[in-house]
Amino acid sequence: MSWFALSFGAALTQATQFALVKGRARGIPPLVIVTWTQAIAAASWAAFFLVSGHAFALPRFAWPAVAVCAVLVMGMSGLLARASARGDISIVGPVFALSPIFTVLPDAALSGTWPSPLGWVGLSLSVLGTSTLSGSGTGWRGLAALFGRRDALDALGAALLLGLVAAVDRWGARTIGPASYLLGSHGATALLAGLIAVLTTPAGLAESVRVRNVVTLVGHGLLGAAGTGMQTTALTMAPAAYVNAIRRMSSVVAVLLGRALFAEPDLGRRLSAALLACAGAACRLLAGR
């Protein structure tokens, strides 16, 4: 399977997670959502090793990368969960699509890859699209108005962290293999988030075992495991900025789901912004050829 197909599959699971959190998990603390999601993903990869007979290997030199990834993923996933639950997913999706911008420097440092000139055009298109989301003009004025919204600001923070996560994931997956790296990183993130959840929101953690919440969290976790697996495998085939560029297509799906399921406003403007992000993704794809 090509890196494009894997990245697009990850985009679809991401948009579905946005909708699932807004529709069924608004009352669940973000840190609890992160704990469950990462634990289910770790269990899924552990099952893969048990069934397939593949050898798990996480050498000591990779431990720092796993630890860094755990901190970054906990922050990123927590911000995304909060933004999706409290805001408009048709805003969250397009803003989160800015993540390739924050991938460029760390990816260059860890993997030695830079965008081509056409790739830079793609990044510029995504910024232009994002600046129109607020309805207060374009450029800096539009961006300032947009990031006055809490959901947009949370999504921007998540996009920044995803840019860093993607670069670390690319290094880890290429160095020790996607499966071993993912089991290690998901497990570490689940332990870290779970410990902090026990200390800061024990009531929320206890409430999460109700049947309705369990169904929601397991579904969210399985989507996350599938999406992360597809993305990390794609990262072994292409630069992180290219993979994240295709994942930006989740912004279009998020806008459409937001309108269809939650009657979110400004469909035309938000869809235009998401389509500009996709145009940027197309530039990145062409630049990779």
Label every PLM stretch briefly.
Residues 1-8, 101-160, 170, 265-289:
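Juxtamembrane helix-loop boundary signature in multi-pass membrane transporters
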Residues 164, 177-180:
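Generic multipass alpha-helical transmembrane bundles of integral membrane proteins
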Residues 68-73, 82-130, 182-191, 240-260:
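Specific alpha-helical transmembrane segments that line the substrate/conduction pathway
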Residues 1-68, 75-87, 135-154, 187-220, ...:
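Membrane-interface interhelical linkers
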Residues 170-174, 236:
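Short amphipathic helix-loop junctions that connect adjacent transmembrane helices
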Residues 15, 19, 46, 70-75, ...:
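Hydrophobic/small/kink-forming positions within alpha-helical transmembrane segments
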